[in-house]
């Protein structure tokens, strides 16, 4: 890894060959060996296989809908955010906790409920967009070596292991959060590096690549510059990391933290997304979380600020700091929030510089492209249906004509 001696970096990585598609294509995945029970913040690069609500994407990964929006610098505060529809083909970053399981880093919290016509291959390649392979899902669930295209038992709950990386949450000795990225047709290491504001050398070092060549289905660990927190170990959000140019929600959606664009210093303010939040006033002051006061003097500028110090024992902790600086700071610049996309922009994940509840797995998931995007009323939730849709006018007309011809026979 960049920032480590080259020999140690190469020894710390294991490149595994995994089945990337039912047709037998092979994809390379960077695997980080580990030991212990620690976890880290990580991101999954997911490409929508159909038009989906934000809540449906979140339910698929057991995430909070607003957290998904925040991680992509999409407006997360407006009413009805979870019900917004995202277009098929849209690449998203999904926040996850990267654990240590069976000696390697992976996200093991995702559970998927199979629907009629689901197969291991379709779940791996379509529903989870290549983040997992059919063999990995089979092994994680102790299934027999059956045909990956054989139908699964409807309603069966599957553990879906997903790739992730921690690498001490650093890159070149600077804070970083790692994105698991599935290489798509037409991608090159150069284009991937440009899209994610990193370098070919950095991607090559992190993934122990002998040459900067990738193939569709490969999964790369992409280091993203991030703002690190300095919360005490007792904080429930200890280790919070926010990728540059994005946001994260914490403290039960009471606090929003952002990173960039001017620097890589974490900046947290009240989120105002819930009515039941503990006090956010700094002790022994009139300042609230995120407030900064500045007073110019002959010797410089006296600056006082109230900062977030983590969620400790269910209470929002704050920290007051004061000091003399050479000049007074200007207004804080926040990362720009984008409107919900209605079409796919192939350029990048982010600009430069009653749906399922939050974190509730098992919500309705749209069908495959070309099939119904309406979940069957009586079908198992949280999986894919290939039932035909009759919600488009030309299909309704065809159905009416078929019925009319039937009764004329």
UniProtKB/Swiss-Prot annotation:
Protein localization: Cell membrane
Domain LysM, chain residue ranges per copy = 110-160, 179-222
- Tissue-level expression: Expressed in roots and leaves.
The record's section on CDD domains has: LysM
Q: State the Gene3D superfamilies in the record.
A: LysM domain (3.10.350.10)
Signal peptide position in this chain?
A: 1-27
One Gene Ontology term of the biological-process aspect is: innate immune response
Task: Give the UniProt keywords, A-Z.
Answer: Cell membrane, Disulfide bond, Glycoprotein, GPI-anchor, Immunity, Innate immunity, Lipoprotein, Membrane, Plant defense, Receptor, Repeat, Signal
Lipidation (GPI-anchor amidated alanine) occurs at: 387
Instruction: Enumerate the PROSITE patterns for this protein.
Output: LYSM
Keyword field contains Chaperone: no
Q: What does this protein do?
A: Functions in innate immunity. Functions as a pattern recognition receptor (PRR), sensing bacterial peptidoglycan (PGN) and fungal chitin at the cell surface. Involved in resistance against the bacterial pathogen Xanthomonas oryzae pv. oryzae (Xoo) and the fungal pathogen Magnaporthe oryzae. Binds PGN and fungal chitin in vitro. Involved in microbe-associated molecular patterns (MAMPs) perception and participates in the activation of defense genes against the bacterial pathogen Xanthomonas oryzae pv. oryzicola (Xoc) or the fungal pathogen Magnaporthe oryzae.
Q: What else is known?
A: Plants silencing LYP6 exhibit significant compromised defense responses and enhanced susceptibility toward the bacterial pathogen Xanthomonas oryzae and the fungal pathogen Magnaporthe oryzae.
How would you summarize the oligomeric state and partners of this protein?
A: Interacts with LYP4. Interacts with CERK1. Interacts with CEBIP.
- Official protein name in the record: LysM domain-containing GPI-anchored protein LYP6
The gene coding this protein: LYP6
